[in-house]
Design a protein with these regions (language model features):
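Short, acidic/small-residue loops that bind anionic groups at enzyme active sites
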Residues: 164-174
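Ferredoxin-reductase
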Residues: 10-13, 83-160
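Short helix/loop capping segments that flank catalytic or ligand/cofactor-binding pockets
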Residues: 52-54, 100, 151-152, 166-168
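Conserved small/polar residues in nucleotide/adenosyl-binding loops
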Residues: 180-185
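An N-terminal, well-structured beta->alpha segment
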Residues: 8-105
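Polybasic, low-complexity association/targeting segments
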Residues: 1-2
Length: 191
């Protein structure tokens, strides 16, 4: 599917809010912007995801967060019941949409039967790393773009040792993200 077809698919999706749909309609005559947002998905690596906050396949938004979290949930579920009980700690920084993205991630994890410890207020990355170990969590998620400009947000993932994911887990999440994004904006795949 080319970027224009992907754009049209998103535009027609019932999963979009009215605001999201209006954002996409506003770029209808800007071919370069459509290409930038829909030429391919954000790439998931050992540090997670980072990108500008816009509606689109190649940007940080609630749909991309949900797909990445479903991939992460699959990795945790593959570790077994004990890993699911240990669960995940989730925190966020003060960037726009960080709380929304953290809650979306928490909902996907909970929907997969994985215990969630969601911080109620802003926390720095080192505190999440500590919390994962202190609470005996299987994993952690921090919604932050670190040093990147304010237009960005990110999704950092951690394993039970409080460090970034092992490469094999990151690769599994990346594979799953590609599966979910092949039917972009299909909300049924996100939870």
């Amino acid at each position: 599917m080319n970027y224009r077809q992907e754009y049209e698919k998103w535009l027609a999706s019932p999963a979009l809010s009215e605001d999201e749909r209006n954002e996409l309609k506003a770029i209808a005559n800007d071919e370069k912007e459509i290409e930038n947002r829909f030429y391919g998905p954000l790439e998931f690596g050992t540090a997670g995801l980072r990108g500008t906050m816009y509606v689109g396949l190649h940007n940080m938004n609630r749909h991309v967060i949900r797909w990445a979290t479903q991939g992460f949930a699959n990795v945790i579920r593959a570790e077994g019941e004990e890993a699911m009980k240990k669960g995940v700690a989730i925190c966020m920084d003060c960037r726009n949409h960080s709380m929304e993205f953290a809650r979306a991630a928490a909902c996907v994890m909970a929907g997969n039967g994985i215990s969630v410890k969601l911080f109620e207020s802003l926390r720095p990355t080192p505190e999440l790393s500590f919390a994962v170990r202190e609470y005996g969590c299987e994993a952690g998620i921090n919604v932050t773009a670190s040093h990147n400009p304010k237009e960005y947000n990110g999704y950092k993932v951690y394993w039970s040792d409080g460090a970034q994911l092992p490469p094999q887990h990151a690769a599994a999440i990346a594979r799953d993200c590609l599966l979910y994004t092949s039917d972009a904006a299909d909300e049924a795949r996100s939870v």
